[in-house]
From Swiss-Prot:
It comes from Saccharomyces cerevisiae (strain ATCC 204508 / S288c). One of its GO terms (biological process) is regulation of transcription by RNA polymerase II. Induction: Induced by anaerobic conditions, hypoxia and cold. Repressed by heme. Residues 222-241 have a biased composition (Low complexity). Residues 303-346, 440-472 form a coiled coil. It is found in: Nucleus. SUPFAM superfamilies: Zn2/Cys6 DNA-binding domain. This is Sterol uptake control protein 2. Residues 374-385, 469-487, 552-562 have a biased composition (Polar residues). Pfam families: Fungal_trans_2, Zn_clus. The gene is UPC2.
Length: 913
């Protein structure tokens, strides 16, 4: 009875019993193998202690150190990873039993276990092993180390030499037998409650939480037992208080015979006696309350622990978020400081350059000082932008500093309907930005593209200066001031003045104040006399107004005009300009003049600029309408008037006019470059503040820059081996693509815009030609035999939208705005088709070759009528496959703006036409 009680109590207080799996082993050739194993690996244990390579290959390992033979033969790195058995609840315990030749069974439960498992074996397992080895029962259970007086006397009477000769196993077995006898005697004397009764079994868990009794002699133990028996009859009315530890909890009972708490932790050896005391076992309602309080206490501790963990996690997240924000702010500050330092270095370099005209130097410095706050304001606007555009602005700042973090094109393309995407997104190397199709993101991309274009022009201008030096005096025109009755030579254009405009107003000021006593060459007179500068600007405004009212040229230049001009058409044009000037002079008041004076400080206009503006109003705009780029009311009336409100449009207009005039006049190449740079610089600021008011000005500037880039594609004006207009043979693609980003930024246009219908794509009529029976579009007619096998086009074809747009281009070849539609086709590519093209799809490449033939044929056909297409026809080869290193793929990557000018290896000048 006592042995059964000990076994039941052992099951109650120990961990849940693990399942045992007995594996019977036999000896074969001196090795122990399992009798149930099958297959070719029957006579080994599948390298359970072998190296990692043999375990992975499931082959036998000789377990050689430092490297096994198989790893040595295969030249592999041999590693031995320690075995970590899973300590899961209810795990299976494998017990190996060896059957000898005589039929007897030998237990090997601890032979094959790793050292870490042997250390984790409980005292119960040690006792069981010892008892099994001696043929005893497996149901032994260790009790307290304290024994009765009679037992201690019997142990002391044993011979000393027997103790010395005992092995550790026999000593453990003897101690177990003695403890077993002591437990039998104890329960026979104090067995008021059956050991297997429900009261005793249910109290097993709480018994572990009771404070242990210190081990001592048997007399003290009996005294404590008697005192506790006396206290058992008294009702326990005192409530139990919850505490942090079980010792504090159960130590709160005010019992006279309660032993003092010990400093060491509880163990089986020092707490078993106190656990088995009868008076320590609660019963009835008190026991239920104790269990409930204990459960509530455990839940409270668990909740507190979860709250502490949650607070720590939230604190860690806040710290990480603060660190990320701080790092981003530091990076932006570093970018801003580095950018400002570069600007300061540019200012210092320009101040150190020799300049004979001190007034011009002072005017340049004043202009750059005014540009400083504007650049700071732009940086502050970037810092105050929302989180959706933070990464785009940061990349824009990096690009302005020359730190390119992108391996492909920096310009997004506008898909059908104005959907913004780029090559990084297609190739999966771009971090997604929230609301990537927002107006702010498009504006940032356009500003970045304009910054790259401006940087490209500045580098080209600097290279021209290094290789060819400054232009000679004979290259610059010498205008005369008819209004003042005297002549003065304008300041010679310098290639180093790439960012600032040429011929500052201070030179005109000296012409107008030649008879005055104040010397304009004195720096103090230029810096301190602000009113004098305002007067000079006002004189310039009056001069402009007088030129428009009287239609008399104020600048006399040596020009070689064509002699076959139609006098009647010229007089009609003059009358129209006079009428427009009269209307503007009547409607313009004092406020408009003040506005012109304020805007003139951003872009200085000299007499050469007046000539260029007059040339546009008389000669250039008819060529634009002849190319069917919108109607005459836009380019003749609307654009010149709008240019006085937006300096970036004025500079773009003057650059295009200078390009047209440079075909017949020399010495204007530097003016083309300077006005183009000023237009790009001011456009970078304007695209960050897109509104409905400046939309038309931005679109007009983009269209003019596209036409100017096409006109300068061949790089006609050259000195030595360098192009004076700073355009490389393949750079026109780069600038056409960059200017197209402005159209992407302002897309979609408002219906009140003058350019509402320009380069629009309407594919809504495709729904009327769909054949539902065969699932194809039968109205799309093949216009190129090289892609005839792609027709009819299925509804699920990835080429559907692209072929539909090409079909509309082919049909509308003779309609208006076709030139802009055909050159902006890459900006309207379907996203799916663009992905196929970037991955080298043959069908997509064939379609782009067909488009190239359409582009080449149109440019060749109209080059005699449209002057700014003459340069394009000179750089486009006859066949797209003439490109070196891959043919059409390189050409289309160039035209799509895939990293130009850094990525492209194509040089158009290498091809002979």
């Amino acid at each position: 009875m006592s042995e059964v009680g000990i076994q039941n109590h052992k099951k109650a207080v120990t961990k849940p019993r693990r399942r045992e799996k007995v594996i019977e082993l036999i000896e074969v050739d001196g090795k122990k193998v399992s009798t149930t194993s099958t297959g070719k690996r029957k006579f080994h244990n599948k390298s359970k202690n072998g190296c990692d390579n043999c375990k992975r290959r499931r082959v036998k390992c000789d377990e050689g150190k430092p490297a096994c033979r198989k790893c040595t033969n295969m030249k592999l790195e041999c590693q031995y990873t320690p075995i970590h058995l899973r300590k899961g609840r209810g795990a299976t315990v494998v017990k190996y039993v060896t059957r000898k030749a005589d039929g007897s069974v030998e237990s090997d439960s601890s032979v094959d276990l790793p050292p870490t498992i042997k250390k984790e074996q409980t005292p119960f397992n040690d006792i069981q092993s010892a008892v099994k080895a001696s043929g005893s029962s497996n149901d032994s259970f260790p009790s307290s180390a304290s024994t009765t007086k009679s037992e201690s006397e019997e142990k002391s009477s044993a011979p000393i030499e027997d103790k010395n000769n005992m092995t550790p196993l026999s000593m453990g077995l003897q101690g177990t037998i003695n403890k077993k006898d002591m437990m039998n005697n104890f329960f026979s004397q104090n067995g008021t409650i059956g050991f297997g009764s429900p009261e005793r079994l249910n109290s097993g868990i709480d018994g572990l939480l009771l404070p242990p009794l210190p081990s001592g002699n048997m007399g003290a133990f009996q005294l404590q037992q008697q005192q506790q028996v006396q206290q058992q009859s008294q009702p326990q009315t005192q409530a139990q208080q919850a505490s942090g530890t079980p010792n504090e909890r159960y130590g709160s009972f005010d019992l006279a015979g309660s032993p003092a708490l010990q400093s060491t932790g509880m163990s089986l050896s020092n707490s078993l006696s106190g656990m088995l005391l009868c008076n320590r076992i609660p019963s009835g309602q008190n026991y239920t309350q104790q269990q409930l309080q204990y459960q509530l206490h455990q839940q409270l501790q668990l909740q507190q622990h979860q709250q502490v963990q949650l607070q720590q996690y939230q604190q860690l997240r806040q710290e990480q978020h603060q660190q990320v924000q701080q790092q981003q702010q530091e990076q932006l500050q570093q970018y801003q400081q580095h950018f400002l330092q570069q600007q300061q270095q540019v200012l210092l370099q320009q101040e150190q350059q020799p300049n004979d005209e001190e007034g011009g130097v002072q005017e340049e410095n004043s202009k750059k000082v005014k540009e400083g706050p504007l650049q700071s304001q732009t940086s502050e606007t970037t810092l105050n932008s929302d989180a959706a555009t933070l990464q785009a602005d940061a990349l824009s700042q990096l690009s302005k500093m020359g730190l390119s973090l992108k391996s492909l094109s920096t310009f997004p393309t506008a898909g059908i309907g104005g959907v913004s995407y780029d090559f990084q997104e297609l190739l999966g190397i771009k971090f997604p930005i929230n609301n990537g199709n927002s107006r702010a993101t498009k504006a940032s991309n356009a500003e970045e593209a304009l910054a790259n274009m401006q940087e490209h022009h500045e580098r080209a201008a600097a290279s021209v200066k290094e290789n060819d030096g400054q232009l000679s005096d004979t290259k610059s025109p010498a205008p005369s001031n008819n209004a003042q009755g005297g002549s003065a030579s304008i300041m010679e254009p310098q290639a180093a003045d790439a960012v600032s405009t040429m011929a500052p107003i201070s030179m005109i000021e000296r012409n107008m104040n030649r008879n005055s006593n104040i010397s304009p060459s004195t720096p103090s007179a230029v810096l301190n006399d602000r009113q004098e500068m305002q007067d000079s600007i006002s004189s310039l405004g009056n001069l402009t107004k007088a030129a428009l009212e009287n239609n008399e040229p104020t600048i006399s230049l040596q020009t070689s005009q064509t002699e076959n001009e139609d006098d009647a058409s010229r007089q009609d044009m003059t009358s129209k300009i006079n009428n427009e000037a009269d209307r503007s002079s009547v409607s313009a008041g004092t406020s408009n003049i003040a506005k012109l004076l304020d805007l003139s400080t951003k872009g200085n206009l000299n007499l050469i600029d007046m000539k260029l503006f007059h040339h546009y109003c008389t000669k250039v705009w008819p060529t634009i309408t002849a190319a069917k780029v919108s109607g005459p009311e836009i380019w003749r009336d609307y654009i010149p008037e709008l240019a006085f409100d937006y300096p970036f449009l004025m500079h773009a207009l003057l650059a295009f006019s200078a390009t047209h005039l440079s075909r017949t006049e020399t010495g204007l190449e530097q003016y083309v470059s300077s006005h183009r740079l000023d237009a790009l610089r001011l456009l970078r600021e304007a695209v960050l503040e897109i509104s409905e008011n400046n939309t038309d000005a931005l679109v007009a500037s983009a269209l003019i820059l596209i036409m100017d880039s096409l006109a300068n594609a061949s790089g006609n004006g050259t000195v030595g081996n360098q192009s004076l207009n700073s355009m490389s043979p393949s750079a026109w693609i780069f600038h056409v693509k960059g200017a197209a980003t402005i159209l992407t930024a302002v897309w979609p246009l408002s219906e009140r815009s003058k350019f509402h219908n320009i380069i629009s794509v309407d594919l809504s009529d495709l729904g009327d030609v769909i054949n539902p029976d065969v699932g194809t579009i039968t109205e799309l007619v093949c216009f190129d035999e090289s892609i005839a096998d792609l027709y009819p086009v299925g509804l699920d074809s990835p080429y559907l939208i692209t072929l539909a747009y090409l079909d509309k281009l082919h049909r509308e070849k003779n309609q208006g705005d076709f030139i802009l539609r055909v050159f902006t086709f890459p900006a309207l590519l379907d996203k799916t088709f663009l992905a196929l093209l970037m991955t080298g799809d043959l069908g997509a490449m064939r379609i782009m070759r067909s488009y190239y033939k359409l582009l080449r044929g149109f440019a060749t056909e109209v080059k005699d009528k449209v002057w700014f297409l003459e340069g394009v026809t000179q750089v486009l080869p006859q066949d797209v496959d003439e490109y070196s290193g891959g043919g059409g793929m390189h050409m289309m990557l160039d035209f799509l703006g895939g990293g130009l000018p850094s990525m492209t290896t194509t040089n158009f000048s290498d091809f002979s036409l």
